[in-house]
Curated annotation (Swiss-Prot):
Source species: Xenopus laevis (African clawed frog)
Main function: Troponin I is the inhibitory subunit of troponin, the thin filament regulatory complex which confers calcium-sensitivity to striated muscle actomyosin ATPase activity.
Residues recorded as bearing N-acetylserine in the entry: 2
PANTHER family associated with the record: TROPONIN I, TROPONIN I, CARDIAC MUSCLE
Keywords: Acetylation, Actin-binding, Muscle protein, Phosphoprotein
Protein name: Troponin I, cardiac muscle
Gene: tnni3
Taxonomic placement: Eukaryota, Metazoa, Chordata, Craniata, Vertebrata
Tissue expr: Heart.
Length: 244
C-alpha cells in the first residue's frame, strides 16, 4: 500500500509541476484597445437662420477673474496715485519757476542813482526785453511748426488706417478744358478741342438707306394700285399683252 501511495503521490506532484509550468508559459492576454477619442463639438455659426434659437439657449456665464468691488478699489487707487503725481509735478514746476526768477530777475538797486544812471539802466532793461521778445517769438514759431507737423502726421496715419469717413462725392461731367484747369490751375491757357481729331465719315450709308426706304414706299404704292378689280384688270391686260 505504501508503494502505491508513493506512486500516486509522485504522479500528483508531476501533474502539479506540469500545471505550474503551463501557468508560467501561458502568454498574457492582450490588453483591450483604448476607446476612440470623441470628436470635438462642432462650432455653431451664428447665422440668421439659427440666431434666435442660439439666443434662447442657456449660456454659461464665465466668472470674472476680478470682482466688481476689487475692480472699483483698484480704479480708485489708480486715480489717487495719479492725482498725487500731478500735485507733486505742479509743486516742482512752481519751485523751478521761483528759482529761475530769483536767478535772472534780481532786485534793482535804485537808491543813490543819478538821472543819467537811471536812463542808462532803463535802456539796458529795454534791450533785455527786446532780446527776450525775440527769443519768445522764435520759440512760438518753432512750437507752431511742430504742431502743424504733428497734425499732418496724424492725418497721414488716419489715411493709412482708413478710419476717416469718406465724403459722399457727386459725379460731375467736366470738359477737357475744365479738367486741365482743375489740375494745372492758371497755367493752362490752351483750349483743347477734342472733336478736331475725329475722322469725318461720309454720309453714303445714309443716302443708301433713304433710297431703300423710297423703293419700299414705291413697291407699296404698286401693291395698292394692283389691289381690287381694277388692279386685276390691269394685271390681266399686262399678262395678255405679254402672251401676244
Amino acid at each position: 500500500m505504501s508503494d502505491e501511495e508513493e506512486v500516486t503521490y509522485e504522479e500528483e506532484e508531476e501533474e502539479y509541476v506540469e500545471e505550474e509550468e503551463e501557468e508560467v508559459v501561458a502568454p498574457e492576454p492582450p490588453k483591450p484597445a483604448p476607446p476612440p477619442a470623441a470628436p470635438p463639438p462642432l462650432i455653431r455659426r451664428r447665422s440668421s437662420a439659427n440666431y434666435r434659437s442660439y439666443a434662447t439657449e442657456p449660456q454659461v456665464k464665465r466668472k470674472p477673474k476680478i470682482s466688481a468691488s476689487r475692480k472699483l478699489q483698484l480704479n480708485t487707487m489708480m486715480l489717487q496715485i495719479a492725482k498725487a503725481e500731478m500735485e507733486r509735478e505742479e509743486e516742482e514746476r512752481a519751485r523751478e519757476k521761483e528759482r529761475y526768477l530769483a536767478e535772472h530777475c534780481q532786485p534793482l538797486q535804485l537808491s543813490g542813482l543819478s538821472r543819467s544812471e537811471l536812463q542808462d539802466l532803463c535802456q539796458e532793461l529795454h534791450a533785455r526785453i527786446d532780446v527776450v521778445d525775440e527769443e519768445r517769438y522764435d520759440m512760438e514759431a518753432k512750437v507752431n511748426k511742430n504742431i502743424t507737423e504733428l497734425e499732418d502726421l496724424n492725418q497721414k496715419i488716419f489715411d493709412l488706417r482708413g478710419k476717416f469717413k469718406k465724403p459722399n462725392l457727386r459725379r460731375v461731367r467736366l470738359s477737357a478744358d475744365a479738367m486741365m484747369m482743375a489740375l494745372l490751375g492758371t497755367k493752362h491757357k490752351v483750349s483743347m478741342d477734342l472733336r478736331a481729331n475725329l475722322k469725318q465719315v461720309k454720309q453714303t450709308k445714309k443716302d443708301d438707306a433713304d433710297k431703300d426706304i423710297r423703293e419700299v414706299g414705291d413697291w407699296r404704292k404698286n401693291v395698292d394700285a394692283l389691289s381690287g378689280m381694277e388692279g386685276r384688270k390691269k394685271k390681266f391686260e399686262s399678262t395678255g399683252a405679254a402672251a401676244v
